[in-house]
């Protein structure tokens, strides 16, 4: 319950920061997001602003994978932990696997949706990198649907709003672990088509 409440506070906090920063954004397809449903949200990643516009646009409480180093920052790190964010050690494959296991517990025991940037790092504009498997393994193991999210920036960001596009959620009930590459290709193609 606390993490759900913290998630809603993060939603309001993100909206306020964007408003006071004079950053405009719009979202298409919000009607495809059910308020009482949990998702594994798979998104492209282009800017540090991505997290803010996602939290501000999607009303559901969200946790996300983030670098373990950020948890060491005083106050900020504590706040992220309280909100249910998930630490990732990218230099250690076993630790990365434990992050997926932690996310699985979180999505099963809370009302949080999980946000995942499968590229693993920021990519400029319309060039998608290869997708890592962690978020898709989580979706298949948990049987929660994947919600593809595309964030669109113009190369000249001055006075241009950021656009978010939500596509239809993808049911993962019929996907086995051996099908994860098929699922990855499906989601990646959806996001790439919005970027083109």
Predicted regions: what is each one?
Residues 28, 65-67, 89-90, 118, ...:
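Thr-Gly-centered strand-to-loop micro-motif
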Residues 17-18, 80, 107, 139:
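A generic structural signal for well-ordered alpha-helical segments
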Residues 1-12, 19-21, 35-93:
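Catalytic core of membrane glycerolipid acyltransferases/transacylases, capturing the structured
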Residues 20-28, 97-98:
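Short gly/ser/thr-rich secondary-structure transition/capping motifs
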Residues 14-15, 77, 104, 136:
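Short glycine-/small-residue-rich flexible loop motifs, especially phosphate/cofactor-binding loops
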Residues 25, 62, 164:
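A broad, low-specificity signal marking well-ordered, structured residues that form hydrophobic/aromatic
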Residues 29-34:
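Glycine-rich helix-loop-beta junction characteristic of Rossmann-like nucleotide cofactor-binding loops
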């Amino acid at each position: 319950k606390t993490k759900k409440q913290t998630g809603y506070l993060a939603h309001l906090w993100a909206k306020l920061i964007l408003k006071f920063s004079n950053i405009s954004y719009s979202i298409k397809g919000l009607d495809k997001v059910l308020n009482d449903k949990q998702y594994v949200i798979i998104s492209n990643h282009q800017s540090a602003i991505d997290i803010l516009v996602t939290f501000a646009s999607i009303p559901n409480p969200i946790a996300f994978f983030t670098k373990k180093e950020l948890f060491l920052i005083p106050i900020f790190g504590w706040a992220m932990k309280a909100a249910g964010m998930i630490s990732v050690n990218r230099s250690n494959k076993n630790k990365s696997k434990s992050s997926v296991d932690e996310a699985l517990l979180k999505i099963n025991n809370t009302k949080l949706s999980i946000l995942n940037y499968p590229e693993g790092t920021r990519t400029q504009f319309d060039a998608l990198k290869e997708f890592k498997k962690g978020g898709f393994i989580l979706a298949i193991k948990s049987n929660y649907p994947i919600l593809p999210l595309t964030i669109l920036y113009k190369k000249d960001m001055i006075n241009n709003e950021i656009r978010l596009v939500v596509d239809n959620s993808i049911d993962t009930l019929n996907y086995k672990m051996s099908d994860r590459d098929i699922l990855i290709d499906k989601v990646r193609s959806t996001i790439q088509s919005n970027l083109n």
